[in-house]
Swiss-Prot record:
Belongs to the phospholipase A2 family. Group I subfamily. D49 sub-subfamily. Keywords: Calcium, Disulfide bond, Hemostasis impairing toxin, Hydrolase, Lipid degradation, Lipid metabolism, Metal-binding, Platelet aggregation inhibiting toxin, Secreted, Signal, Toxin. This is Phospholipase A2 147. The lineage of its organism: Eukaryota, Metazoa, Chordata, Craniata, Vertebrata. It comes from Drysdalia coronoides. Residues 1-19 form the signal peptide. GO terms for biological process: arachidonate secretion; lipid catabolic process; phospholipid metabolic process. It comes from the Eukaryota.
């Protein structure tokens, strides 16, 4: 085998090992990202909401810093209510569609799927209606969220 082939093979193996250590994104959070894009008509990338204020992103504490952060707190609380019902909101897939007026849940008969879809649609529409303040992205939560 030629040295160049060995290098390519090694690079592929290392890439696969690295990819194997990345946990898969829960399906519902991917869908939620699509709902956000639908609601805001693609005006802001989903990742802008992943580290915003005290509640947008992982965890949450304190008082929301603005209306958008309040949307995230409401969404977090809604997921908490879903968990109390025995649902797994971050893992549930559901049917939805993107219409001219934003996202909607399709005809969902299973209670958990309907509940979680409603949480996500309400939050996505709330995000679209709330102003985005760049100063509240990636804030020091130890100072602002107690």
């Amino acid at each position: 085998m030629y040295p160049a082939h060995l290098l390519v093979l090694l690079a592929v193996c290392v890439s696969l090992l690295g990819a194997a250590s990345v946990p898969p994104q829960p399906l519902n959070l991917v869908q939620f990202g699509y709902l956000i894009q639908c609601a805001n008509h693609g005006s802001r990338a989903t990742w802008h909401y992943m580290d915003y204020g005290c509640y947008c992103g992982a965890g949450g504490s304190g008082t929301p810093v603005d209306d958008l952060d309040r949307c995230c707190k409401i969404h977090d609380d809604c997921y908490g209510d879903a968990e109390k019902k025995g649902c797994s909101p971050k893992m549930l897939a559901y049917d939805y569609y993107c219409g001219e007026n934003g996202p909607y849940c399709k005809n969902i008969k299973k209670e958990c799927q309907r509940f979680v879809c409603d949480c996500d649609v309400k939050a996505a529409k709330c995000f679209a209606g709330a102003p985005y303040n760049d100063a509240n992205w990636n804030i020091d939560t130890t100072k602002h969220c107690q």
